[in-house]
Amino acid sequence: MIDLTVARVTEIVGGALVDISPEEAAERRVTGSVEFDSRAVGPGGLFLALPGARSDGHDHAASAIAAGAVAVLAARPVGVPAIVVAPDPRTGDGGLTGVLEHDADGSGAAVLAALAKLAKAVAAELVAGGLTIIGITGSSGKTSTKDLVAVVLELLGEVVAPPESFNNELGHPWTVLRATRSTDYLILEMSARRPGNIAALAAIAPPKIGVVLNVGTAHLGEFGSREAIARTKTELPQAIMQSGVVILNVDDPAVAAMADATVARVIRVSRGSYSHPGSPNSPDVWTGPVSLDELARPRFTLHTRDPRAGATEIQLGVYGDHQVANALCAAAVGLECGASVEEVAVALAATGPVSRHRMQVTTRADGVTVIDDTYNANPDSMRAGLQALAWIAHGGTHDKNQPGSCARRSWAVLGEMAELGEDSITEHDRIGRLAVRLDVSRLVVVGGGRSINAMHRGAVMEGSWGLETVNVADPAAALTLLRAEVRPGDVVLIKASHSVGLGALADVLVGDGAIRP
């Protein structure tokens, strides 16, 4: 974070000084990071007192000060120097009530509202000094694209990007406050669970470059329809000023339509060839035919409208055909910021999975390949994961009977896709059937409930008999089964929504065998 006095922070957030005099607040400076975990606080830091599942941050204020924090941003006095922003029903909290699960009295919402004010002020000052902000949204692929963009932009300057998927009302402003005066590029993921979320995040740190990847069915339960999801994703292009740039994946018709919703310049990316110059959605950055290697890493030729750039071969270091659109968007960001096509190609080739549990492919010493894609799941990403599994297991083809293929036994260990609302039963049924159509050898459905039953039943109805498809109670039961029956050379995909907890299973399964160099 930029260097600010405690007095200035208090002024920005509209708080009151408690257990610290105005004179001392004018002298004390926040020179470290802003943290919501007291164990992460260091000298010069600012601690956010937020309610949690196991404890309330207000109860850890003293330990944060002892660790070097200069003050605590809190909703009530905490017995140590604090900036207090008590909940005020007359002014509201900017729609932040309910964001934190364990926030019965609204104290967490008050602190989040203050955090947003602080991040907004810091972002404005840094943008005035030359910072470029990139915002990324989409129903799937945000984190993978963020990681790719970060690696490309690191060629050009200092980059700040969120770890993992810090993309909500807490993670977004927290990431903004990681930026300093030496930061050149700030990359932000923007997620949404209700209309207005993306607009609110964009108002905190207005992006100069906005990227929209796709409109899918993630969080369909909250929005009610794909059209409502599209309207919310459109909030990002609408937030970009005329001097900015919007990058759209026009292979998704809902995203292509967003070009009409922005006053900014539009850069279109597509997997299709550039065959219709002048048509509304003719791309500015596009690929030739895409091929996959034996581990489903895409290779393609990158084309741009710049006649000086020519066509450039790119071999991605990440896994899955679905990564092509993410890489195209990352390339478009890099080119817009001044990277050459050759620099983009080198960066994308050198980048494997960065964030944990997202298409991490590991081959153990015994030849078992584990595809860990357990961070989250929705119908689109689940289909992509199954297609990658089939490709790797069938030796670089989706058809194990194709001449030259070297089929390996495949396992799909799948859990629930959360937040799909009324479509949950149908979507889980489709995934079960798809696993059979892709000739997955063994399908292990983890958990219980109507959606999981639909996935299991869908596979059975599609023709999976006997022990080819099983339903186990929990991740522990799945691990027991895998340890007993996985053989050297098998390929195992593990995927579900984060709440299912399959990430720990993937970690153990990978650790069961030394990794092949």
From Swiss-Prot:
Keywords: ATP-binding, Cell cycle, Cell division, Cell shape, Cell wall biogenesis/degradation, Cytoplasm, Ligase, Nucleotide-binding, Peptidoglycan synthesis. This is UDP-N-acetylmuramoyl-tripeptide--D-alanyl-D-alanine ligase. Belongs to the MurCDEF family. MurF subfamily. GO terms for biological process: cell division; cell wall organization; peptidoglycan biosynthetic process; regulation of cell shape. ATP binds at G138, S139, S140, G141, K142, T143, S144. Involved in cell wall formation. Catalyzes the final step in the synthesis of UDP-N-acetylmuramoyl-pentapeptide, the precursor of murein. GO terms for cellular component: cytoplasm. Pfam families: Mur_ligase (PF01225), Mur_ligase_C (PF02875), Mur_ligase_M (PF08245). It comes from Mycobacterium leprae (strain TN). Its EC number is 6.3.2.10. It is an enzyme of class 6 (ligase). It catalyses: D-alanyl-D-alanine + UDP-N-acetyl-alpha-D-muramoyl-L-alanyl-gamma-D-glutamyl-meso-2,6-diaminopimelate + ATP = UDP-N-acetyl-alpha-D-muramoyl-L-alanyl-gamma-D-glutamyl-meso-2,6-diaminopimeloyl-D-alanyl-D-alanine + ADP + phosphate + H(+). GO terms for molecular function: ATP binding; UDP-N-acetylmuramoyl-tripeptide-D-alanyl-D-alanine ligase activity; UDP-N-acetylmuramoylalanyl-D-glutamyl-2,6-diaminopimelate-D-alanyl-D-alanine ligase activity. SUPFAM superfamilies: MurD-like peptide ligases, catalytic domain (SSF53623), MurD-like peptide ligases, peptide-binding domain (SSF53244), MurE/MurF N-terminal domain (SSF63418).
